[in-house]
Amino acid sequence: MLAKRIIPCLDVTGGRVVKGVNFVELRDAGDPVEIAARYNAQGADELTFLDITATSDERDLILPIIEAVASQVFIPLTVGGGVRTVEDVRRLLNAGADKTSFNSAAIANPDVISQASAKYGAQCIVVAIDAKRRQGAEVAERGEGWDVYSHGGRKNTGLDAVQWAVEMARRGAGEILLTSMDRDGTKSGFDLQLTRAVSDAVGVPVIASGGVGNLDHLADGVQQGGADAVLAASIFHYGEFTVRQAKERMRERGIPVRL
């Protein structure tokens, strides 16, 4: 069994790391370069850097910050937010990213995933899916399940999250970064039903995201959700736990990790 990965996530806006609840109510968590260096030192397996307002602000990639982060980090770095084209992938890889994450652009133009994967390889193409459980009338109309949201969680695309994950993997995504919008920042644990549904449906690794409040939640994402990697922000940013503590807890629960 391959080692399961722990991935701290840096949500960045205005050049600062922030953290919110259900994608809003953002509070400052610090300087991205300093925080990235700290996680690198703590033994994180990878880092994910998301420019969370690039798409909604129609801004370009923040390459200088990405270069500064990459210079401090000697583990795989995934960068997302505002990634729109195959050319953007080239620019990010040149700036020091190891993987690039598409979200809204993949919804607008699914061919970009096929093209980027063909050019640079599936191993550096991640598709991020922000999913929200259907409620009320949506359930009556379309049945139980989850919809995909774009533009930083502001727009319901009407796409089914599980079907979309399958389509993205088919087109060449090497990994799915799956965030439960319902759980984001709530500290109540991953949406394990969502994680399991997507993990069971695709043949590529799934990174569970959204809702981690304690170390057991990380282990649950792997053991109950079927995730290959688990992503967290709040519990690490504000010093509640270190990556090392997270790995030790996962090992206690019988999950293979790199210590």
From Swiss-Prot:
Pathway per the UniProt entry: Amino-acid biosynthesis; L-histidine biosynthesis; L-histidine from 5-phospho-alpha-D-ribose 1-diphosphate: step 5/9
Keywords: Amino-acid biosynthesis, Cytoplasm, Histidine biosynthesis, Lyase
Chief localisation class: cytoplasm
Catalytic activity: 5-[(5-phospho-1-deoxy-D-ribulos-1-ylimino)methylamino]-1-(5-phospho-beta-D-ribosyl)imidazole-4-carboxamide + L-glutamine = D-erythro-1-(imidazol-4-yl)glycerol 3-phosphate + 5-amino-1-(5-phospho-beta-D-ribosyl)imidazole-4-carboxamide + L-glutamate + H(+)
Cellular localization per UniProt: Cytoplasm
One Pfam family it belongs to: His_biosynth
Keyword Cytoplasm: yes
Enzyme Commission number: 4.3.2.10
A Gene Ontology BP annotation from the UniProt entry: L-histidine biosynthetic process
One GO molecular-function entry: lyase activity
Gene Ontology cellular-component annotations: cytoplasm
Signal sequence coordinates: none
Similarity comment text for this entry: Belongs to the HisA/HisF family.
Assembly with partners or alone: Heterodimer of HisH and HisF.
Function: IGPS catalyzes the conversion of PRFAR and glutamine to IGP, AICAR and glutamate. The HisF subunit catalyzes the cyclization activity that produces IGP and AICAR from PRFAR using the ammonia provided by the HisH subunit.
Protein name: Imidazole glycerol phosphate synthase subunit HisF
Protein source organism: Acidovorax ebreus (strain TPSY) (Diaphorobacter sp. (strain TPSY))
